């Protein structure tokens, strides 16, 4: 069956590939035929005519800034130990930011702010406005201060004496670029003293798969000094002052910070859904209300760097929350990550160089902390095993009378001092731990690019085999070995637990422990290898603990003797037990009455 399953997807994939190639060949042939019908001189003439019309329109729009309407793109670079910032004279804005300490999957330097445009509207003449991003500024020479920071100014001046000055300053060991905007003649350049700022952004793939990175991308912002975010195709209108807006990818972010707040604005964000390397596009419109004065200044800052919790914490209030340690329905795991997982992880990373071993130590720490509950669970399981013969006798006695069996079973548990739900506590505890680690491993940049054993990157899935087709239900076109080890150890735990518990008569319950590990195969195959490695180690520890505790620590004869002793001691029923038994007795009476009532023919 498995061979047929894989063969089907391989054959389907081959057919689709052939069909795409055939369609492309047809399109190429049509394009070549159409190109032959167009004369070269007609193409040149059309281009010249289009350029002339475009230039005339730009000059007209620029009005008093007509000299800045046309120009040639030139760039200037500011650098420190962490980043290299390329500035362009067109718009006097940032063209790109290269992060020196981070690389992409193909070993190229990580670049941010590549498909960005930042600018604002200025009055250029009567009833005419232009975007600053369309005007050509004149750059000054670079200046270097005693503290090691470098600065440059971009200036444009109008025929009426107004001017715009952009000053950029890059400080040592910083991912933040200071951007000061000075408007000379602001009362003429702005309408009603409002600076309407526009930021157009488009993010591209930096991690292994664009699809997964899209899921991890979002827009974060601080409105009214409170953190919030949007992660679906959405539009957000700001009703309170905004401190910063951030375009976030899985491990990096580009954040625009207003040192004196944006007064209002809106952001529109949407993910791409095609097969390209593009992730999302954003249009952010922000307003800054300036005093009605001849000259005005706006202090901004552009952060382009890693989503590192400690770095962002020092950057601006609430910016560290860009790192997703748990949000929405998983917000309850954020304190676990912030106050337990992250400090312990960083502590181990302080003296262990390989992050795979750090994950192992973190796993052992978690299992050590939860060990009292684990022991309690195994003890409860041992008590249930000791009571199995008596439970079988009760079950045989009551037969199909489920109500009677349940009442007698509860009585037996109470007399023996057994909590039937005692074994569930560690399993329930694993739920918040799993979701906490899922958020942590997907957002902790220290894991990015870190190799361990056969995994090349602990922040992404490991690959031991690439398939010629893609398996649905989230499995993908690869096989992760850490996923296989996690699933196999989960199967072993299920087999061991089934051998220690009474046999289930219900076929669905009987096979349920085996179904869950199989489901993990599809859930885990695309998750970070750090998470599947954690799960593997945790399962191995579980198997070891079960074997040692059940065979060398827990004495079943002693447990039976203790339970027999407890039965001799009269126990007062709790209010909950009394109510529960009354409810069961009422249900039994109703069932007996229903069974005695003759059915109508």
Briefly describe each language-model feature range.
Residues 1-44, 87, 172, 179-185, ...:
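Helix-loop-helix
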Residues 39-73:
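Short, Gly/Pro- and small/polar-rich lid/capping loops
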Residues 32-36, 46-47, 61, 122, ...:
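Intrinsic disorder/low-complexity segments
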Residues 68-323:
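Soluble non-transmembrane domains of integral membrane proteins
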């Amino acid at each position: 069956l498995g061979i047929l399953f894989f063969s089907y997807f391989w054959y389907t994939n081959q057919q689709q590939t052939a069909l795409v190639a055939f369609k492309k060949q047809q399109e190429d042939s049509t394009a070549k035929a159409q190109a032959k019908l167009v004369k070269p001189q007609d193409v040149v003439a059309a281009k010249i005519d289009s350029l002339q019309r475009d230039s005339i329109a730009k000059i007209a729009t620029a009005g008093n800034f007509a000299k800045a309407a046309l120009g040639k793109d030139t760039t200037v670079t500011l650098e420190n130990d962490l980043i290299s910032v390329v500035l362009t004279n067109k718009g006097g804005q940032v063209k790109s930011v290269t992060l020196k300490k981070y690389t992409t999957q193909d070993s190229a330097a990580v670049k941010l702010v590549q498909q960005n445009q930042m600018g604002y509207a200025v009055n250029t003449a009567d009833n005419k406005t232009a975007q600053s991003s369309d005007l050509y500024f004149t750059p000054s020479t670079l200046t270097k201060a005693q503290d090691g920071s470098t600065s440059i100014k971009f200036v444009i001046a109008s025929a009426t004496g107004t001017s715009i000055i952009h000053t950029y300053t890059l400080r040592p060991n910083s991912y933040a670029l200071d951007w000061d905007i000075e408007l000379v003649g602001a009362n003429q350049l702005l309408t009603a003293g409002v600076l309407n700022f526009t930021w157009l952004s488009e993010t591209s793939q930096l991690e292994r798969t664009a699809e997964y990175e899209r899921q991890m991308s979002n827009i974060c912002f601080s409105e009214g000094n409170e953190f919030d975010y949007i992660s679906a195709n959405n539009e957000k209108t700001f009703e309170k002052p905004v401190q910063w807006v951030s375009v976030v990818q899985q491990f990096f972010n580009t954040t625009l910070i207003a040192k004196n707040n944006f007064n209002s604005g809106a952001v529109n964000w949407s993910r791409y859904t095609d097969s390209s390397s593009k992730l999302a596009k954003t249009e952010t419109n922000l307003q800054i209300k300036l005093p009605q004065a001849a000259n005005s200044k706006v202090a901004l800052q552009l952060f382009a760097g890693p989503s590192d919790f400690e770095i962002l914490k020092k950057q601006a209030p609430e910016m560290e929350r860009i790192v997703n340690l748990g949000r929405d329905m998983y917000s309850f795991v954020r304190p676990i990550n912030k106050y337990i997982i992250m400090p312990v992880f960083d502590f181990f990373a302080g003296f262990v160089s390989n992050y795979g071993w750090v994950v192992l130590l973190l796993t052992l720490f978690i299992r050590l902390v939860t060990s009292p509950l684990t022991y309690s669970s195994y003890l409860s399981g041992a008590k249930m095993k000791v009571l199995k013969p008596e439970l079988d006798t009760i079950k045989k006695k009551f037969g199909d009378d489920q109500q009677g069996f349940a009442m007698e079973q509860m009585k037996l548990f109470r007399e023996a001092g057994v909590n039937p739900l005692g074994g569930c506590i560690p399993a329930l505890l694993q739920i918040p731990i799993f979701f906490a680690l899922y958020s942590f491993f997907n957002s902790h940049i220290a894991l990015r690019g870190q190799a361990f054993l056969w995994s090349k990157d602990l922040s992404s899935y490991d690959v031991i085999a690439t398939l010629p087709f893609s398996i649905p239900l989230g499995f993908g076109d690869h096989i992760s070995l850490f996923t296989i080890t996690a699933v196999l150890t989960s199967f072993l735990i299920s087999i061991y637990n089934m051998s220690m518990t009474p046999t289930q008569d219900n076929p669905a319950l009987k096979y349920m422990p085996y179904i869950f590990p199989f489901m993990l195969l599809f859930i885990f195959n695309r998750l970070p290898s750090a998470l599947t490695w954690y799960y593997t180690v945790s399962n191995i520890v579980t198997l070891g603990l079960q074997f040692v505790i059940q065979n060398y620590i827990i004495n079943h004869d002693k447990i039976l003797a203790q339970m027999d002793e407890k039965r001799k001691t009269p126990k007062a029923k709790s209010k909950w037990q009394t109510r529960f038994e009354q409810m069961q007795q009422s249900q039994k009476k109703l069932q007996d009455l229903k069974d005695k009532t003759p059915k109508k023919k």
